[in-house]
């Protein structure tokens, strides 16, 4: 037998023996380290010739490949995490999305979303791209999301990070964790004020206002509503001399329905939100708010 053939047989024999030395315990250990499936772990260990670090790299590469192949998939499920600082001056909403409700309700997925949001809260990060470069478990959050995508086979994304600041920031998350609200008040440090803030947050969740007050509405929206009002008046056969007046009346109705402070309070329609807040504490009002819904 020639030396080349002998060497080839020697290498084949030792390679096969090495692969056979990958035990179920090894596979389970890698699974515990990475959370990947048993077969994926076995294949990665075999490809890495039993090297755990290399196997982890292989699995992460697989995750990146899966993520890339799913880049065009819709991620319309997930959770909203709402957090506020201890002094109630800073709040955030983190929207972490997936593809199915099954994954969205998974405890591990929820824990990952909360961990990501907590990093943003602890460092007062208000920019999504900055947050994605923060580290979690030795890798960036962006890499962690890719890794988790590979693990579960669904596209996982940090879709939005929204923050507000104020004297008293109150948060609300709807029971299904798919809708979150932040309200920034101009007063804080009072149980009554906090309770009122919670009521306002629930109002925002239910009524979805477009702005805090009339002056905060986008001018293009106002222009559109006036034109709609005029067209409706003309279609109803109203005289041209009163078309403008009718349109302005419809605009005021738009403000009542769609601006937070002018909306009727859902718990007591006899007052609007501005009046309700003023009853709780003289001069109490809303500085800003944020509303985030999964997939919206």
Protein language model regions, located:
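N-terminal amphipathic/hydrophobic targeting modules at extreme N-termini
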Residues: 1-9
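N-terminal assembly/interaction segments in proteins that build large macromolecular machines
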Residues: 18-296
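Short hydrophobic targeting helices and cationic amphipathic motifs
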Residues: 9-11, 18
